[in-house]
Regions:
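RNase H-like nuclease fold core
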Residues: 1-46, 58, 159
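C-terminal functional segments of enzyme domains
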Residues: 11-16, 73-160
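Short glycine-rich phosphate-binding loop at a beta-alpha junction
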Residues: 65-74
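Feature targets compositionally biased, intrinsically disordered low-complexity regions
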Residues: 26, 31, 37, 63, ...
Length: 160
Protein backbone atom coordinates (compact mmCIF):
# COMPACT_ATOMS: atom_id res chain seq x y z
CA UNK A 1 0.00 0.00 0.00
CA UNK A 2 1.24 3.51 -0.79
CA UNK A 3 1.96 5.80 2.15
CA UNK A 4 3.40 9.30 2.41
CA UNK A 5 5.75 10.50 5.15
CA UNK A 6 5.75 14.26 5.75
CA UNK A 7 8.58 15.55 7.95
CA UNK A 8 9.31 19.12 9.05
CA UNK A 9 11.73 20.95 11.31
CA UNK A 10 11.56 24.28 13.13
CA UNK A 11 14.14 25.69 15.48
CA UNK A 12 15.27 28.58 17.58
CA UNK A 13 18.54 29.51 19.27
CA UNK A 14 18.14 26.82 21.96
CA UNK A 15 16.69 23.74 20.27
CA UNK A 16 14.96 22.29 17.24
CA UNK A 17 11.67 20.43 16.97
CA UNK A 18 10.80 17.84 14.33
CA UNK A 19 7.35 16.53 13.49
CA UNK A 20 6.23 13.80 11.12
CA UNK A 21 2.98 12.37 9.80
CA UNK A 22 2.47 9.12 7.89
CA UNK A 23 -0.65 9.11 5.71
CA UNK A 24 -2.37 6.96 3.14
CA UNK A 25 -5.71 7.21 1.34
CA UNK A 26 -7.56 6.56 4.63
CA UNK A 27 -5.95 9.50 6.43
CA UNK A 28 -3.27 9.92 9.06
CA UNK A 29 -1.86 6.57 10.17
CA UNK A 30 0.91 7.75 12.52
CA UNK A 31 2.24 11.02 13.85
CA UNK A 32 4.93 12.10 16.25
CA UNK A 33 7.49 14.68 17.19
CA UNK A 34 11.05 14.94 18.48
CA UNK A 35 12.94 17.64 20.37
CA UNK A 36 16.69 18.20 20.42
CA UNK A 37 18.46 18.48 23.76
CA UNK A 38 21.95 17.80 24.98
CA UNK A 39 25.34 18.31 23.42
CA UNK A 40 24.34 17.63 19.79
CA UNK A 41 21.28 19.89 19.73
CA UNK A 42 22.98 22.45 17.47
CA UNK A 43 24.40 19.87 15.05
CA UNK A 44 21.62 20.04 12.49
CA UNK A 45 22.86 17.38 10.10
CA UNK A 46 23.21 14.75 12.82
CA UNK A 47 19.86 15.50 14.45
CA UNK A 48 18.17 15.66 11.04
CA UNK A 49 19.28 12.11 10.29
CA UNK A 50 18.25 10.85 13.73
CA UNK A 51 14.77 12.36 13.41
CA UNK A 52 14.46 10.99 9.86
CA UNK A 53 15.48 7.51 11.02
CA UNK A 54 12.96 7.55 13.86
CA UNK A 55 10.21 8.66 11.49
CA UNK A 56 11.15 5.87 9.06
CA UNK A 57 10.99 3.33 11.89
CA UNK A 58 7.52 4.57 12.80
CA UNK A 59 6.42 4.27 9.17
CA UNK A 60 7.86 0.77 8.80
CA UNK A 61 6.09 -0.36 11.97
CA UNK A 62 2.71 0.25 10.32
CA UNK A 63 1.10 -2.78 8.73
CA UNK A 64 0.98 -2.77 4.96
CA UNK A 65 3.51 -0.02 4.23
CA UNK A 66 5.18 -1.07 0.98
CA UNK A 67 5.60 2.10 -1.10
CA UNK A 68 6.67 5.27 0.67
CA UNK A 69 6.91 8.83 -0.60
CA UNK A 70 9.00 10.99 1.72
CA UNK A 71 8.18 14.71 1.62
CA UNK A 72 10.84 16.92 3.22
CA UNK A 73 10.24 20.42 4.52
CA UNK A 74 12.44 23.12 3.01
CA UNK A 75 14.41 23.29 6.29
CA UNK A 76 15.44 19.65 5.72
CA UNK A 77 16.59 20.14 2.14
CA UNK A 78 20.23 19.37 3.05
CA UNK A 79 19.12 15.99 4.36
CA UNK A 80 17.19 15.38 1.14
CA UNK A 81 20.27 16.26 -0.93
CA UNK A 82 22.36 13.82 1.10
CA UNK A 83 19.79 11.07 0.66
CA UNK A 84 19.72 11.44 -3.14
CA UNK A 85 23.55 11.59 -3.19
CA UNK A 86 23.79 15.16 -4.45
CA UNK A 87 25.84 16.26 -1.43
CA UNK A 88 28.51 14.30 0.38
CA UNK A 89 27.31 13.28 3.86
CA UNK A 90 28.99 14.88 6.87
CA UNK A 91 28.44 11.72 8.93
CA UNK A 92 28.81 8.71 6.61
CA UNK A 93 27.88 6.10 9.23
CA UNK A 94 24.63 7.86 10.16
CA UNK A 95 23.89 8.34 6.45
CA UNK A 96 24.38 4.60 5.85
CA UNK A 97 21.90 3.84 8.63
CA UNK A 98 19.36 6.14 6.98
CA UNK A 99 19.89 4.40 3.63
CA UNK A 100 19.52 1.01 5.32
CA UNK A 101 16.22 2.06 6.88
CA UNK A 102 14.82 3.13 3.51
CA UNK A 103 15.56 -0.41 2.35
CA UNK A 104 12.73 -1.66 4.57
CA UNK A 105 10.27 -0.50 1.92
CA UNK A 106 9.61 -2.14 -1.44
CA UNK A 107 9.95 1.24 -3.11
CA UNK A 108 10.45 4.78 -1.92
CA UNK A 109 10.83 8.19 -3.49
CA UNK A 110 11.87 11.56 -2.19
CA UNK A 111 10.03 14.82 -2.61
CA UNK A 112 10.50 18.27 -1.20
CA UNK A 113 8.13 21.10 -0.66
CA UNK A 114 8.15 24.46 1.01
CA UNK A 115 5.53 24.20 3.75
CA UNK A 116 3.96 27.62 3.42
CA UNK A 117 0.35 28.69 3.51
CA UNK A 118 -0.18 28.96 -0.24
CA UNK A 119 -0.93 25.74 -2.00
CA UNK A 120 -0.04 23.43 0.87
CA UNK A 121 -2.06 20.29 1.47
CA UNK A 122 -3.60 19.75 4.94
CA UNK A 123 -0.95 17.19 5.92
CA UNK A 124 1.87 19.63 5.14
CA UNK A 125 0.23 22.34 7.22
CA UNK A 126 -0.48 19.91 10.05
CA UNK A 127 3.09 18.64 10.33
CA UNK A 128 4.47 22.18 10.34
CA UNK A 129 1.94 23.27 12.98
CA UNK A 130 2.86 20.28 15.15
CA UNK A 131 6.55 21.16 15.02
CA UNK A 132 5.86 24.82 15.80
CA UNK A 133 3.57 23.89 18.69
CA UNK A 134 6.18 21.57 20.22
CA UNK A 135 8.86 24.25 19.93
CA UNK A 136 6.52 26.87 21.38
CA UNK A 137 5.69 24.65 24.33
CA UNK A 138 9.41 24.33 25.13
CA UNK A 139 9.59 28.08 25.70
CA UNK A 140 7.20 28.07 28.66
CA UNK A 141 8.07 27.09 32.22
CA UNK A 142 5.63 24.19 32.13
CA UNK A 143 7.08 23.09 28.80
CA UNK A 144 10.62 23.15 30.16
CA UNK A 145 9.56 21.00 33.09
CA UNK A 146 7.90 18.58 30.68
CA UNK A 147 11.07 18.58 28.56
CA UNK A 148 13.13 17.72 31.66
CA UNK A 149 10.70 14.92 32.53
CA UNK A 150 10.92 13.60 28.96
CA UNK A 151 14.73 13.73 29.08
CA UNK A 152 14.66 11.60 32.22
CA UNK A 153 11.79 9.19 31.57
CA UNK A 154 10.57 9.36 27.95
CA UNK A 155 13.73 9.41 25.90
CA UNK A 156 11.93 8.34 22.69
CA UNK A 157 11.06 11.91 21.76
CA UNK A 158 14.40 13.45 22.77
CA UNK A 159 17.34 13.68 20.36
CA UNK A 160 20.48 14.26 22.40
Amino acid sequence: MKHTLYIAKVGDEKRAAYAYIVTNYEGIQAAGHFITAGKHRHDGQMTDHIAFQRALRAASALAGVVDLTIVFDHSLIDLAFEMVAVERPKYPSIYQNSVRLTGRFHSYEFASTDFNETGACPEEVSVMDDAMEVLGNCRTFKGRLLLLKNCLFNNKIIIS
